[in-house]
Amino acid sequence: MLEIQIIRDQKARVISGLKKRGFSDERLQILDQIINLDDQRKDVQTRLDSLLSERNSLSDEIGNLFKQGKAKEANELKSKVQSIKENADSLDQQLKSTISDLDGLMVTLPNIPHETVPEGKSAEDNKVHQAWSGKLPILPEGSVPHWELAEKYNLIDFKLGASISGSGFPLFRGKGARLQRALVNYFLDQARNEGFEEIQPPLLVNADSAYGTGQIPDKEAQMYYVGLDDLYLIPTAEVPITNIYRGQIIPEANMPVKLAGYTPCFRREAGSYGSDVKGLNRVHQFDKVEIVWIEHPSKSYDTLKLMVDHVSMLMDSLELPYRILHLCGGDMGFTSATTYDFEVYAAAQQKWLEVSSVSNFETFQSNRMKMRYRDANGKTQLVHTLNGSALALARIVAALLENNQSANGIKLPKVLVPYTGFEMID
């Protein structure tokens, strides 16, 4: 959630940022509504504080009068205190209503794009931050997409997964399952080598956690909800891992906080259809290793580069062609201040598939979660939060199968062999 003080003090920047996200002049009127409600909140709070202060003073005076044996005067003041209490209760209800209205508007505002975010309305306007400089794979005649390879080598059973759960829930088996486990372990080892603490978080979260990272209310329709227990299946490990520090004050000396975790991820992907959803291209359940970084505001953009470099290292080590896109304002996620997407090239499909998003949220998440740090002077300030996929497995597996196929089978990258125990799928 945006900080209200930023809306008040940097209104021109907020307007410019929201326009970059596609806000019309009519939609921008919400800013004046927010400021007016905040003015009302301050006014009601001031009047309420004044009444409460007066009530406390009168209560002390009543106590002193009773001690002095002046019961008549004390009882007269008690009736005045009762009147003040009724007025204070009324103001308290008014304050709660105003805050509720204010919060209802605030949660509809997305994060303000960083000044470097490209202009644009949709994915077509994203800018290539780093193009693939090498040659794209040239496949032998008769090469097929990964879903056919998965069937040929008995790696993934899409039909059985659909029979058990529904479409979009692939069942990995044999070397397919071992490849999944190998990738998870490899990615976690690389994160640990970079100083990330490994976390194994819950797969179900409550509404407060989903709200804290921004999934609620923006992405609620894309989440699986367990109504009997009022819990949500996580769409990404970002949600439970970032919430580890919800409501906490982190000593500045303990920063940065670097966390990494593997989880299955669950996404409804409502409205998805067509060739882009075939095989592993778009599924409802997939495995992912996530890295989360909690950082001092002055260092977060240097940190963002380190996270992008980490994901680049993983892609290079897997010997996969990839490119990095800088998302435009119109395609960026609700909570993000800036996002870099990694896309892998799947040679049999001749498509670029997203396998990672690395984002800086600045104070958007930490403001919702009341996550702060305490500086050397004892002052508390909001931290910056960042996260990235390092990596999402489904499309990585798709690219590994497609790009490395030959007449003899599928050869795996060297870095994975110690984890799989085999170098060929045949």
Features from the language model and the residues they span:
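N-terminal alpha-helical targeting/anchoring segments
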Residues: 1-136, 155, 159
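TRNA-recognition modules of translation machinery and tRNA-sensing kinases, especially anticodon-binding
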Residues: 23, 27, 131-426
